[in-house]
Amino acid sequence: MNRISRYYFHRSVLSLLIAAMIYAPPGMTAFTSNVIGVVNDETVDGSQRVDERGATNNAHIINHGNQEVYGGISNGSVIDTGGHQEVSGHGSYQGQANNTVINGGSQTISEGGISTGTIINDKGTMSVLTNAKADATRIDNGGAMDVAGNATNTIINGGTQNIYNHGIATGTNINSGTQNIKSGGKADTTNISSGSKQVVEKGGTATGSNIRAGGTLIVDTGGIAHGVYLDTGSALVANTGAGTDIDGYQRSSHFTITGGRAEHVVLENTGQLTVVAQTSAVDTIVDAGGKLIVHEEAVAYTTRLNNGGILDVREKGSATGIQQSSQGALVATTRATRVTGTRADGVAFSIEQGAANNILLTNGGVLTVESDTTSAKTQVNAGGREIVKTKATATGTTLTGGEQIVEGVANETTINDGGIQTVSANGEAIKTTINEGGTLTVNDNGKATDIVQNSGAALQTSTANGIEISGTHQYGTFSIASNLATNMLLENGGNLLVLAGTEARDSTVDKGGAMQNLGQDSATKVNSGGQYTLGRSKDEFQALARAEDLQVAGGTAIVYAGTLADASVSGATGSLSLMTPRDNVTPVKLEGAIRITDSATFTIGNGVDTTLADLTAASRGSVWLNSNNSCAGTSNCEYRVNSLLLNDGDVYLSAPATTNGIYNTLTTSELSGSGNFYL
């Protein structure tokens, strides 16, 4: 018997008296335990039973509360955390729950029960069991609904609906959130909006799903989805595994995935098709955000790889007839069985029998050249990467914004603007050409020989054990061998780290270049825009570091520790600074002839040992005595040099930032020439 009115009952005086018998044990709220009439606005924190003669309005079911609607009616109940409501039929009467709000509590609709208009809020749960019904349920963020019965017209706003065996959901609208269709569960006419998804698990069935732009349909192996419609900008995630059965329309074209064969599938916006062993995909379109994965013993025929799409061909997988756009990403290995296609520039490419030819890598594309295989004429653009494994060989690779990682051998690589070739331990690069804006990085135990370093190219390396480098640049030949670097050119991002116990000679640091010396260097030239440091790297200070004949011609040089012997600083942007020693075990020493000219600046920190230095400041070159806060106590900050020659030069004895009456003092055994002292 179906009743919709809460005022249905005609009750005797006796029944009214019974309905009014209320018992409340100590500590509990008074409520009607057995409802056979109509009760309003009760708070239930114990057990309440509503049979076919009863109805409740606006019940509040709180922690430990349990309302059993056993053939009766519940209108407007609110179920808080720890509260529970169970709705079931009794005999020929259906139990009804209307407009329930679940705030962290739970509601179970059992056989013969009906719910209408339930709202499930955060941490609230609703279970619709076999032969039970739920209509117009709303599942908000954090709420969950489990369906083994019948659910119609559900709205999902950030929550989750799970459809189990024998469960049927019809007319669901997923505005955000998820609908999971388990084995034996069915969903019909589901609308999936942006940011939401429908998941069809093995043995589950979806019919007539409509996936809007930004929405996602996920079909697991063995899942069934018939009559689906995917808008432009929606995502299909599926595979060709056993039992998978999908058909529908994308962009007004029919597609299918059935019997281990996918035809005319469009992948975009996180969509993904996985082609498993012994199956195939035909005429796939991979658009921006889409991905096609081809596994071992699987085949993809006539794939169109558009800008922003990814085609991933795994070991022993095959993909033939590829049409690759200029920004389509191919991810492949030279152990693929067969990969063929045409690039956007009309060049044919292939991977067969362990040899890759003319591969274009861009925008996330990766070619892995495996051991005992080869690649030739690979084009690596921005976002692309070629990985040359141990015992593999790559020949004629061109890097234009992309990267090549060399663990094996790379021959005749050309590095253009934005390109990077990294030679790893035991890797070898032969006849690499580095053009302006390109970078060659050689790591410990790496080898790079016959390099051509053109103007504006960057070389990044160190004097570490095992590094072997040779080549030519605008200043002649250069090399690193046996921990000795000779005639290196560092510019435009290039850098050299001279490790403790190693040496560099005749290095040139140009604009954008950098050199750090923890060992020894001689005749280093630091030009405008170049940076040089002695005695410090990002990891350590080195007291035994030493530099001789340092030439700072418009660049910047800083001595943190060690000894500088003989130096010149020139040009208005030229700057040489000797920092206050960090501690007693990392002293800073200056000795020999130091010449500051042409408006250059030379700064000496307090505590630097300059007693063996002969200073010349000429042509408005300036010497600054910079004590900072290092001169404490009551004594003056003392500076000593062996000799000081001024030829229109300047000396600044800036006041220490300490107690009044403390001064910088400069003592020299010989003072000559003409210039200015500023106190």
Spans of model-derived segments:
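Long, low-complexity, polar and repeat-rich extracellular regions
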Residues: M1-L679
